[in-house]
Amino acid sequence: SIAAALTASFRHRETRKIYWAAVAGVPHPRNGTIKFGLVKAFGHGARGEGEKMYCVHPKDMETTEGAKRATTDYATLAQAGKRTCWMALIPVTGRTHQLRAHMAEIGHPIVGDGKYGGSGQENMGDGWGAQLGGDISKKLHLHARSLTLEHPVTKARLNLTAPLPDHMARTWDTFQWAPSDVPADPFEEDWR
């Protein structure tokens, strides 16, 4: 069936998902791969509400119960000084909160991510969010930008692109970041 073919395509990682995010600071190097494993810490609610993923160093994977391998590719597309930048992210593995946990682990949490440390816009002191203030929404700045997959019947390559949500579009306007200024797939060799 078509549904089974699509499910298999996702399971076998034959799809390509690119996310866009605004993050605190600017990573160095500007492009790279994050290979920290993830382990789940359950929340305090009756149904485990508030669960959070914690990163596990690759050397500790074998000795950390419940740890699962996780890999994220990232590329810096633009920046606003040293305070924030526009990232493209590919979850090579598809773990819960993977992108959010990985970006926080390397010191560049996603803007608006209260769970993983990216809610610093309110910091009026020396935090990354100082001087950004009310112009930037406190909502999570993570967006599933594109999905590329093979059509299950015709086998043609499909590229699906979603526009930025309103709160992120306002942020992009504030920083004068234009989606038309970057390639659809910044991970292609000729762009990097």
What are the language-model segments listed below?
Residues 1-192:
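RNA pseudouridine synthases
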